[in-house]
Amino acid sequence: MSTVGSTVSSTPSRRFKHRNVNTFLTYSRCPLEPEAVGLHIWSLIAHWTPVYVLSVRETHEDGGYHIHVLAQSAKPVYTTDSGFFDIDGFHPNIQSAKSANKVRAYAMKNPVTYWERGTFIPRKTSFLGDSTEPNSKKQSKDDIVRDIIEHSTNKQEYLSMIQKALPYEWATKLQYFEYSANKLFPDIQEIYTSPFPQSTPALLDPTAINTWLENNLYQVSPSAYMLANPSCLTLEEATSDLIWMHETSRTLIPTGSSACTSSGQQEQASPPGPGAWEDIITGRTTSTGPPTTRTQNTTSSTTYPSSTVHAGSN
């Protein structure tokens, strides 16, 4: 049976730390056989010399199965990998079973079937401080919360463990625990992946962009064209005009005359000044261009010789 540690919930966290000779695991909604789970845990902690492993199947309220595992070893099992105890994609709730007696009694309260190996070693130190046991010392709230922070692997598990260990504080200070949960286990932001393949140069799907331009910027409906052109009276005429404009606007039309390449320079015209003003008054015209032949229309008129007319009678 392989150990899977690649799921989101089992990603190694720098905050996670487990170190204890008694390990209590709960696999929620796990259909695996207790024997297979127990054998896997036994081989998994072989480095720390296992002495007892109990694997119990329990029926949940929704009809599914839970697996509880109590693992005891001669040396403390130490790991900072929250996915260390994962089995075939199933991630357990991991706790330090400081009161092995209570944990074993809890796991065996209503078993469907179970598997165990080795010799159970009773422990008298209670995780929450059991006053019924002799020489027991009640654990402080700081120690309880510290242990929860070290063993929780996600936000939901952290709040659930707080609720079980400190119910009054959970009910009266839930907003503070939720804040600390968000800080301990921040949401992982998804990396954006473009749906379009990379191109050269790196453009984003020019075909889709061109289609958008055609439908939004370069398209005019016949009805809108008729409103802008009152002389267009029918939809057929408007459609015909739009088709013509569409084809014409995408066809290079020759200008009809080539660009001038002559290096000759025109003479610079004289700027207006006193001389020009005098010409305007006297009626003279100053030519600023090349000489031209001007034809002046003349009309015949009767001229009289210059003579002295004496008034009077002979």
Swiss-Prot record:
Motif window: RCR-2: 66-68
State the protein's name. Answer: Replication-associated protein A
Tell me if Metal-binding is a UniProt keyword of this record.
Answer: yes
RCR-3: where is this motif?
A: 106-109
So what family is this one in? Belongs to the geminiviridae Rep protein family.
Cofactor annotation: Mg(2+); Mn(2+)
- Show the segment(s) annotated as Oligomerization: 180-192
Q: How does it assemble?
A: Homooligomer. Part of the C- and V-complexes which are RepA-Rep-DNA complexes involved in the c-sense and v-sense transcription.
Q: What is known of its domains?
A: There are 3 rolling circle replication (RCR) motifs. RCR-2 may be involved in metal coordination. RCR-3 is required for phosphodiester bond cleavage for initiation of RCR. The LXCXE motif specifically binds to host RBR1.
For this protein, the record's SUPFAM superfamilies field holds:
Origin of replication-binding domain, RBD-like (SSF55464)
Q: Can you tell me which residues bind a divalent metal cation? A: 58, 66, 68, 110
| Top-level EC class | hydrolase
Q: Which GO terms describe its biological process?
A: DNA replication; symbiont-mediated perturbation of host cell cycle G1/S transition checkpoint
What Pfam families would the database entry show?
Answer: Gemini_AL1, Gemini_AL1_M
Q: Which residues form the CRESS-DNA virus Rep endonuclease domain?
A: 17-120
- Cofactor: binding comment: Divalent metal cations, possibly Mg(2+) or Mn(2+).
Record organism:
Sugarcane streak virus (isolate South Africa) (SSV)
Q: What is its EC number?
A: 3.1.21.-
